[in-house]
A protein has these predicted regions:
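Metal-dependent phosphoester/phosphodiester hydrolase catalytic core
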Residues: 1-558
Length: 558
């Protein structure tokens, strides 16, 4: 029986600068991720002659391949097909969608780079439970728009900044599968428990026909946030100790890290990085790579400093540094840090490497750097209480508040907030500074633009660009809370909390220059030379079902 395609293809890494391994032919490169239903050789064959192949590797009874494609032409778009053991499996027979293409952006002077980003996509359709009023899915709507006009302007890369799946908030369809497999009264109940159940989340998210086609033709880069594992993942040392004391947590965290490595992380790597990765080589060489990957996940959980999920991409004269703000945390209250020392050193090196070689610096972090001022001050206040600054009873209150209110962004790690602020200021203030330094984030279920006050003298414009969710719902009371958090009254309340916690005064202030916008939405940066334009599109429901993308905001940044 011929091998079949279970999931994918996903077009992941696309590079117009011949970023393949040293022994690959010249030309642009790409990687395509697939899951097959049995061991096989997966091949990508392009209409212009570019191609690549890879043997599947096995994890927990599943069969995957990451196919390096070489010989692509920068500036060109070529349709491609996927074959398993030389049997065509993509495009699907009778597909209503246009052919999937690999489009390699040009990186020369005058060429534009379009970077779209967002986060927090609950994959269930709007009619399911709590999302009955959530509205159309922004990725579904983008797919419908592009499929209707294949020549329309499209992103050169799609950044998915966390909560690609919700391991702790499963849909009715997934809950039915869980109940058929095990007793839902046993922990973790309706949450996923192991690798197999994680695979169902990705099936649901990426198997959606519109999103499946979109991800087959628009390159993507991804980083996790908390719901990819569990709400409030690594919020504090006491939280982690409590989780490790449960009978189900170890399998959950190992399966979460294993599935992230397979489904998301591998596609962030270039063909050269894949070829040099010892774990990838070990997994591919083994008849069954499960134990090797499980050992890696166990080591990463025990000592996060041994693993790096952060990554860097250079798109011509645009640099993207994506920071892991979940797994690399140092949680000891006396030394809390968003990043361990080695991770922080690596991020700094990537940001400051080769000064003058880029016109735009994009720092992607699932958690916003600049928050509404009230929330920032509340997080700094809570962190001060937890350190014992107001005594033991206030420390208990601070920890309880931190967990109940999700007070775990950069502001909840004051030393790390100051470190990141200093790094961005240094990058923006050099004589050979880029035109813009943009922090791209999600998580907070609304979109906004914020800018530091008093940075007009720097060489670069520094901005916090936040866009969330792609598909989720936010109660009206929470919307009101976010609006209040940006208000003057909210600022005054935040300062009062900071004084109570004896929090040092902030070294700089910031103001909101756009938003807040609420809804299912996607931000896009268009970068051309030293010019930059921002656009926000929101998914709006249309009569008769479905949705359309509506341009809510467009502005020039540089």
């Amino acid at each position: 029986m011929a091998a079949g395609l279970r999931l994918g293809p996903l077009l992941r890494y696309v590079d117009g600068s011949a970023g393949g391994a040293a022994d690959t032919p010249a030309g642009a490169t790409a990687t395509v991720w697939v899951e097959a239903d049995r061991p096989c050789t997966a091949r990508v064959r392009c209409a212009d002659g570019a191609e690549g192949s890879a043997r599947t590797f096995q994890i927990a009874g599943h069969h995957y391949a990451v196919i390096p494609v070489t010989g692509l032409t920068p500036g060109a778009a070529t349709p491609y097909e996927v074959l398993l053991d030389d049997h065509g499996v993509w495009p699907l027979p009778g597909s209503p969608f246009p052919p999937s293409t690999i489009r390699v952006p040009e990186t020369g002077d005058g060429s534009a780079l379009r970077v779209a980003f967002g986060s927090c996509r609950w994959a269930a359709k709007p009619g399911n439970g709590r999302l009955a009023r959530g509205g159309p899915d922004a990725l579904d709507t983008l797919a419908t728009t592009l499929a209707a006009d294949p020549e329309a302007e499209r992103p050169d890369v799609l950044l998915l900044l966390g909560d690609q799946v919700y391991a702790d908030e499963t849909s009715p369809a997934v809950r039915r599968r869980l109940a058929a497999r095990r007793d839902p009264r046993d922990p973790p109940g309706s949450e996923v428990a192991d690798y197999e159940e994680y695979s169902w989340l990705y099936d649901e998210s990426w198997g959606d026909p519109e999103v499946r086609w979109l991800l087959s033709t628009v390159p993507s880069s991804m980083i996790f946030d908390d719901h990819d594992v569990i709400d409030d993942w690594n919020t504090s040392a006491s939280w982690l100790a409590e989780m490790r004391a449960t009978p189900w947590w170890r399998e959950r965290i190992l399966s979460g890290l294993m599935s992230y490595w397979v489904y998301q992380h591998l596609g962030n790597l270039s063909p050269a990085e894949l070829a040099a990765d010892p774990l990838y080589a070990e997994v591919c060489a083994a008849p069954d790579g499960t134990e090797a990957l499980r050992r890696f996940a166990s080591e990463a959980d025990a000592d996060p400093a041994r693993t790096r999920w952060s990554n860097r991409r250079d798109f011509g004269r645009t640099r993207l540094v994506t920071i892991d703000t979940r797994a690399a945390r140092v949680l000891d209250e006396d030394g809390r840090s968003m990043l361990d020392p080695d991770e922080a050193r690596w991020v700094r090196e990537q940001v400051l490497d080769a000064p003058g070689s880029y016109d735009h610096l994009l720092v992607a972090t699932s958690l916003p750097w600049l928050l509404p001022p009230l929330i920032h001050d509340a997080e700094a206040w809570s962190a001060a209480l937890c350190r014992g600054g107001r005594g033991r009873r206030w420390a208990w209150f601070g920890e309880d508040l931190r967990r109940r209110s999700d007070l775990e962004h950069w502001a909840a790690f004051p030393a790390s907030f100051d470190w990141l602020s200093g790094l961005l200021t240094e990058a923006a203030g050099r004589a050979d500074a880029p035109a813009t330094v943009c922090v791209l984030s999600g998580d907070v279920h609304h979109a906004y633009v914020a800018e530091p006050v008093g940075d007009e003298g720097t060489g670069a414009r520094v901005l916090q660009l936040t866009c969330s969710p792609l598909h989720n719902a936010i109660p009206a009371v929470v919307r009101l809370g976010f609006r209040f958090a940006w208000s003057r009254a909210g600022r005054r309340l935040g300062r009062a909390l900071a004084r109570h916690g004896r929090v040092p005064r902030r070294s700089f202030g910031w103001h909101r220059t756009g938003g807040p916008w609420f809804g299912n939405q996607l931000m896009t940066l268009t970068l051309r030379g030293r010019a930059a334009t921002l656009r926000l599109n929101q998914a709006r429901a249309v009569r008769g079902g479905g949705g359309r993308l509506e341009r809510t905001e467009e502005r020039r940044l540089a």
